[in-house]
Curated annotation (Swiss-Prot):
Pathway(s) of this molecule: Phospholipid metabolism; alpha-glycerophosphate cycle
GO-annotated cellular components: cytosol
Highest rank taxon of the organism: Eukaryota
Binding, substrate: K121, R270, N271
Catalytic residue positions: K206
Reactions the enzyme catalyzes: sn-glycerol 3-phosphate + NAD(+) = dihydroxyacetone phosphate + NADH + H(+)
Annotated protein name in UniProt: Glycerol-3-phosphate dehydrogenase [NAD(+)], cytoplasmic
Signal sequence, start to end: none
Binding partners and assembly: Homodimer.
Cellular localization per UniProt: Cytoplasm
A Gene Ontology BP annotation from the UniProt entry: carbohydrate metabolic process
């Protein structure tokens, strides 16, 4: 890496803009980082003016993080290659569907010794079947290492400066330290673990479970039912990682990227909110995205589809009844009210055992 580490944030939505507040402040304050941070912004017109111009003049992303000032050293750039070409650290924070195309644009245009970190919660379909982790796609296309950052980090709360934790999954301790320095703040505490794949899988799968929690809220089934969906969702997350990414540590699920992120998303995230409206309004997911998300995309339904694609290929749908039911509800093969029937006889309820009597 260069003596002064250059940073580029690829993405400027709600989460990208929130993380820019932390990254920009740290780049300005810490001597190892170049003060100027570039942020790739997909150009849009807002009231007749370019979004990049608004951000650079007012230091506010009025489209995706209204009311929050960005550090003045964060510079909005509408050209992806121009934003990224000098970066030593590339922070990817865009909807996962865009990553393959972005990587094609960046191939051969970035520093060969750069590193990446993905804040993207989702999977992509692999060619020939299965699922691809976003960090793997980035590494494969750009030939650079890619860490991941996942956690119970609702963007607006991070932007407000409310205390939270996050998890960085990084297999190289040397890179883990510089990434921790870049993201750590008084209100944003970072734990680095080496179990990167499990960290990333948690970040994607919890969005599926959050859709189930939203269906429960829409049906007004109460907190007990919602708690059951969250617990069964966690068990399916653990089982999924065990089947498809063996060797991961159970302890990873008890970091911020696991159970904490799952709880937060099932009570406060956009996947829960839109899924509740899906039940109560009778509108499609696509219609609700346009109405409720201000141009942003929902991650839960496409992730559920990609996971179902994998499970179906392996003949494992019946082993993951919650994931399967949520996917089928999202594509209107099942009604939301069918969710509970689908999980009533969950494998977790069948594996019963009798506890030995305690010795008195």
């Amino acid at each position: 890496m260069a003596e002064k580490v250059n940073v580029c944030i690829v993405g400027s939505g709600n989460w990208g803009s929130a993380i820019a507040k932390i990254v920009g402040a740290n780049a300005a304050a810490l001597p190892e980082f170049e003060e100027r941070v570039t942020m790739f912004v997909y150009e849009e017109m807002i009231d007749g003016k370019k979004l990049t111009e608004i951000i650079n003049e007012t230091h506010e992303n009025v489209k995706y993080l209204k009311g929050h000032k960005l550090p003045t050293n964060v510079v909005a750039v509408p050209d992806l290659v121009e934003a990224a070409k000098n970066a030593d650290i590339l922070i990817f924070v865009v909807p996962h569907q865009f990553i393959p195309n972005f990587c094609k644009q960046l191939l051969g245009k970035i520093k060969p010794n750069a590193i990446a970190i993905s804040l993207i919660k989702g999977f992509d379909k692999a060619e020939g079947g299965g699922i691809d982790l976003i960090s793997h796609i980035i590494t494969r296309h750009l030939k650079i290492p890619c860490a991941v950052l996942m956690g119970a980090n609702l963007a607006n709360e991070v932007a407000e400066g409310n205390f939270c934790e996050t998890t960085i999954g990084c297999t190289d301790k040397k890179y883990g330290k510089v990434l921790r320095d870049l993201f750590q703040a008084n209100h944003f505490r970072v734990v680095v673990v080496e179990d990167a794949d499990a960290v990333e899988v948690c970040g994607a799968l919890k969005n599926i479970v959050a859709c189930g929690a939203g269906f429960v809220d829409g049906l007004k089934l109460g907190d007990n039912t919602k708690a059951a969906v969250i617990r069964l969702g966690l068990m399916e997350m653990i089982r999924f990682v065990d089947v498809f990414y063996p060797g991961s540590k159970l302890s990873t699920f008890f970091e911020s990227c696991g159970v904490a992120d799952l709880i937060t998303t099932c009570y406060g995230g956009r996947n829960r909110r839109v899924s509740e409206a899906f039940v109560t309004s009778g509108k499609t997911i696509e219609e609700l995205e346009k109405e409720m998300l201000n141009g942003q995309k929902l991650q839960g339904p496409p992730t559920a589809e990609e996971v179902n694609y994998m499970l179906k290929n392996k003949g494992l749908e019946d082993k993951f009844p919650l994931f399967t039911a949520i996917h089928k509800i999202c594509i209107n093969q099942l009604k939301p009210k069918d969710l509970i029937d689908c999980i009533r006889n969950h494998p977790e309820h069948m594996d019963t055992f009798i506890m030995p009597s305690p010795k008195l």
